[in-house]
């Protein structure tokens, strides 16, 4: 496990050189990715370097999948990579816009998007993998599938306005959402110019 974390941290430490860093991975056990542990302290350092030095000071946008362990009672609050303020944590929704039952909830889920039955390329060469007769997969499912969609949206945002900071990106995503059905929403107070707050849900974040 330490070997895996060491290599993951090493990869993260280089992400400040990129505009967007998609991270479709996460720890399974609660608190196993604690930044206070010696081996993971540099994980937070890598995130800070990304938002402080990435994109010439505007900040790298780190996108993380929320996790697929809602059924076991997991919560993104238990995972430092998902609950770090430097990241965009993404939940998964079904094709009909309702939230996927497996999507891990938490107070730090920013937004959600489709993450069930997506079409993508197969991971293996022809003749191998889960789709041996095809180069495509039509059942890419999980918050790991949802996160890259948000990363793509962020890429289009930065193409339209290269001067956006990483916090601008987070705020625009939150303000651009709609509310999926079947969720209870809480009012989230704000100190904006019009004192207007948003509605939030632990499963969907600010919305879809």
Where would I find each of the regions flagged by the language model?
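Subtilisin-like peptidase catalytic core
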Residues: 1-42, 46-52, 91-94, 139, ...
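Surface-exposed intrinsically disordered loops and tails
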Residues: 6, 13, 29-41, 55, ...
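Predominant activation on well-ordered alpha-helical scaffold segments within soluble catalytic domains
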Residues: 14, 44, 48, 147, ...
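C-terminal subdomain of the subtilisin-like protease fold in secreted/lumenal serine endopeptidases
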Residues: 18-22, 59-60, 86-89, 101, ...
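Catalytic metal-binding/acid-base residues of hydrolase active sites
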Residues: 26-28, 67-71, 93-96, 117
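Catalytic-core regions built around general acid/base machinery
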Residues: 35-61, 77-86
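Extracellular S/T/G-rich loop segment that most often corresponds to the catalytic His/Ser-adjacent loop
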Residues: 79-159, 163, 202-208
């Amino acid at each position: 496990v330490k070997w895996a974390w060491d290599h993951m941290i090493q990869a993260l430490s280089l992400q400040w050189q990129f505009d967007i860093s998609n991270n479709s991975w996460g720890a399974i056990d609660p608190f196993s990715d604690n930044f206070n542990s010696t081996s993971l302290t540099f994980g937070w350092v890598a995130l800070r370097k990304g938002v402080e030095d990435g994109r010439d000071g505007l900040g790298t946008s780190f996108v993380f999948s929320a996790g697929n362990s809602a059924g076991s009672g997991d919560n993104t609050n238990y995972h430092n990579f998902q609950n770090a303020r430097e990241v965009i944590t993404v939940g998964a929704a079904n094709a009909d816009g309702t939230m996927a039952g497996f999507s891990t909830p938490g107070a730090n889920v920013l937004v959600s998007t489709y993450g069930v039955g997506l079409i993508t390329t197969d991971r293996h060469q022809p003749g191998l993998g889960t789709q041996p007769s095809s180069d495509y997969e039509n059942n890419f499912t999980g918050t790991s599938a949802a996160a890259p969609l948000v990363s793509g949206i962020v890429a289009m945002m930065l193409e339209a306005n290269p001067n956006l900071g990483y916090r601008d990106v987070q705020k625009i995503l939150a303000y651009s959402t709609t509310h999926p059905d079947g969720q209870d929403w809480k009012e989230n107070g704000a100190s904006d110019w019009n004192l207007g707050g948003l509605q939030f849900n632990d499963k969907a974040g600010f919305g879809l």
